[in-house]
């Protein structure tokens, strides 16, 4: 058979096959209509740009966009939830420049001025402001009469009021601070306070008497004592330091060092003192108890930008609260803001009011009912 004839035969067979009637598509027994919203299109337009998928699987470029976005989202939320402990680390760092915990009592004997960088300070009252460390066991704090103060833990959780609105009712008294997990003996004769963290901050104010701060300051120096419970019979001497006019800072950073401050407190304090979701959020960006915080270059870039966006977001929340519940008056053009939306726990119907929490710790110091 000639070559031309062979080619014609082959072409004829191909044409015959193509012209044959196709069998009906097989009807599978388990065929199910997939509802809208479950099956993902192969291409999706989002604020991240175009996301591409094959049978629901993201391609490499899409995968990179999504994980970068996830890391950034988590970092911004981690920043907003980390404002409270970072503020406390900065507070403690500034006070430790004056002297060590447990033995140093800074006092603004002639009030505070602009040389000392603090959040929401008053310049018309003498403050006593100090830090306690419970790692070596229970501490006793003898509080003077006629003070108004509080004790907050390292997460800025309220622990107790002190003085006029505390259990001593302004008469002064002995407060026994117990460290996390303490199971030892608790003697009588104290206002017993259980803290969830090892580091704790106490601040109180005295008041002017006939325009004079000295009587209140003198009472603080006369009656204030801090000592381990084991040394109750022979308390060590305290170092009272006048810090009025002192140039020092107690406000936390808003850039990359924010994360280093946050890591410091996560490493120091018991995991039981924070909820697992918050700890999980911080762990997702590399801050986890017992592990080094050492982000690679891409993650460090994300964290640096997230800190800037987090700070900007906190400013927006604080300065331009967007719902009426944050104002004394219904008109949101009003500048009269409420300090505690959701009360001192920043909660409403059992849920954390996130903006109230973050906004408060951006601008303020001290939590008390």
Where are these regions (language model features)?
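Extreme N-terminus of proteins, especially the signal/transit-peptide cleavage junction
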Residues: 1, 24-25
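Bacterial N-terminal signal peptides that target proteins for export
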Residues: 1-10
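Bacterial N-terminal signal peptides
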Residues: 10-21
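A compositional/structural signature for long, glycine/proline-rich flexible linkers
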Residues: 26-369
């Amino acid at each position: 058979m000639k070559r031309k004839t062979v080619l014609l035969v082959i072409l004829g067979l191909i044409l015959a096959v193509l012209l044959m009637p196709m069998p009906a598509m097989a009807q599978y027994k388990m065929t199910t209509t997939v509802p809208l919203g479950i099956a993902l299109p192969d291409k999706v337009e989002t604020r991240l740009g175009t996301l591409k998928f094959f049978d629901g699987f993201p391609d490499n470029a899409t995968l990179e966009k999504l994980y970068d976005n996830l890391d950034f989202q988590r970092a911004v939320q981690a920043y907003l939830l980390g404002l409270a402990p970072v503020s406390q680390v900065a507070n403690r760092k500034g006070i430790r420049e004056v002297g060590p915990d447990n033995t140093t009592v800074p006092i603004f004997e002639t009030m505070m001025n602009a040389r000392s960088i603090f959040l929401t300070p008053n310049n018309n009252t003498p403050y006593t402001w100090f830090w306690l460390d419970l790692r070596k066991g229970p501490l006793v704090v003898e509080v003077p009469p006629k003070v108004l103060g509080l004790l907050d833990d390292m997460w800025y959780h309220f622990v107790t009021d002190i003085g006029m609105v505390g259990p001593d009712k302004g008469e002064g008294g002995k407060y026994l601070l117990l460290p996390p997990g303490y199971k030892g003996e608790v003697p009588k004769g104290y206002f017993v306070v259980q803290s969830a963290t090892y580091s704790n901050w106490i601040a109180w104010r005295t008041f002017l008497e006939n325009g004079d701060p000295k009587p209140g300051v003198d009472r603080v120096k006369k009656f204030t004592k801090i000592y381990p419970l084991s040394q109750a019979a022979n308390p060590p001497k305290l170092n009272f330091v006048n810090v009025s006019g002192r140039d020092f800072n107690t406000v936390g950073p808003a850039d990359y060092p924010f994360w280093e401050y946050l890591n410091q407190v996560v490493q120091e304090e018991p995991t039981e003192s924070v909820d697992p979701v918050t700890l999980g959020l911080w762990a997702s960006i590399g801050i986890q108890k017992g592990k080094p915080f050492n982000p690679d270059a891409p993650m460090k870039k994300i964290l640096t930008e997230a800190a800037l966006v987090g700070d900007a977001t906190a400013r927006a929340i604080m300065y331009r609260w967007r719902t009426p519940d944050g104002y004394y008056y219904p008109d949101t053009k009003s500048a009269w803001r409420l300090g505690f939306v959701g009360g001192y726990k920043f909660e409403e119907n059992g849920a954390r009011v996130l903006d109230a929490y973050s906004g408060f710790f951006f601008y303020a110091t001290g939590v008390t009912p």
